[in-house]
From Swiss-Prot:
GO terms for biological process: mitochondrial cytochrome c oxidase assembly; mitochondrial respirasome assembly; regulation of proton transport. GO terms for cellular component: mitochondrial inner membrane; respiratory chain complex. It comes from the Eukaryota. Its main location: mitochondrion. Cytochrome c oxidase subunit which plays a role in assembly of respiratory supercomplexes. Belongs to the RCF1 family. PROSITE patterns: HIG1. Residues 126-150 are annotated as: Disordered. It is found in: Mitochondrion membrane. It comes from Meyerozyma guilliermondii (strain ATCC 6260 / CBS 566 / DSM 6381 / JCM 1539 / NBRC 10279 / NRRL Y-324) (Yeast). This is Respiratory supercomplex factor 1, mitochondrial. Residues 128-150 have a biased composition (Basic and acidic residues).
Amino acid sequence: MDIIQKMVFKSKQQPLVPIGALATTGAIILASKSIRRGDRIKTQIYFRYRIGFQLLTLVALVAGGLYYQTETAQQKQTREEKLRDKAKLREKLWIEELERRDAVIQERKKRLEESKAELLEVAQQGFEEARETETREAQLKKEEIEEKEN
């Protein structure tokens, strides 16, 4: 809220205060004009008006402050409901974020398990091929030895 919006908002909340301020300003302007003209009686009257308008403005300001200081039960309930709704929304967003993170973690675990299984399979194939090669080599050596003996 910028300053103009804030002034308009406060003026709508307490409409007697700006009216009293304008009336006080008007009384001061009229008093200054009567001073220039040299009319002492009118000057005194306008200054008395100024004091009266200032008093009314001050009373309106204090009364409005007291009125708006004590929230009505409905306003308080509405404010609390807004805060509750905001908290629920935050909680919902947080839960969604946690679920998203959990899904990412589960996907990573799944890929890791698949990768491990694939590596184990490749390693098993390599071991089997190595055994077969060793078995063939052993058979070839055995055959060579048998041929030499014959």
